[in-house]
């Protein structure tokens, strides 16, 4: 279990309320696929991923990006039990999909970049970033749990 301070909880929940998951999700996943093209191998059923423009306009990428962000909403709602919240997803990504667990960290980085770009430094200040990155690190750890 993670020890969250009241300030961290407040920052995470407050920030989450300002995030448009249907906007950030597609942007973040598209950014991952563009910046880290080797991750595309896990999305072979998504159709055309040949160029940045194709990725940005790909409806399957957008849909899965939204799914990822809605999954993060579950973690925000279960801050005290993120590990168990993601137990089944960890098994699926490890045993069925064979996703390199480092890809979760790469996607978390892309989510952070997209949130920061959208909300700006007045909202996404250093304290908020610290709490949000801690939150994402806990999620990444929970998703990678099955790999250990």
From Swiss-Prot:
InterPro entries: Globin, Globin-like_sf, Globin/Proto, Hemoglobin_b, Hemoglobin_oxygen_transport. One of its GO terms (molecular function) is haptoglobin binding. Keywords: Heme, Iron, Metal-binding, Oxygen transport, Transport. GO terms for cellular component: blood microparticle; haptoglobin-hemoglobin complex; hemoglobin complex. GO terms for biological process: hydrogen peroxide catabolic process. The keyword Heme applies. Residues 3-148 form the Globin domain. Red blood cells. Heme b binds at residues 64, 93. Belongs to the globin family. Involved in oxygen transport from gills to the various peripheral tissues. Heterotetramer of two alpha chains and two beta chains. This is Hemoglobin subunit beta. It comes from Oncorhynchus nerka (Sockeye salmon).
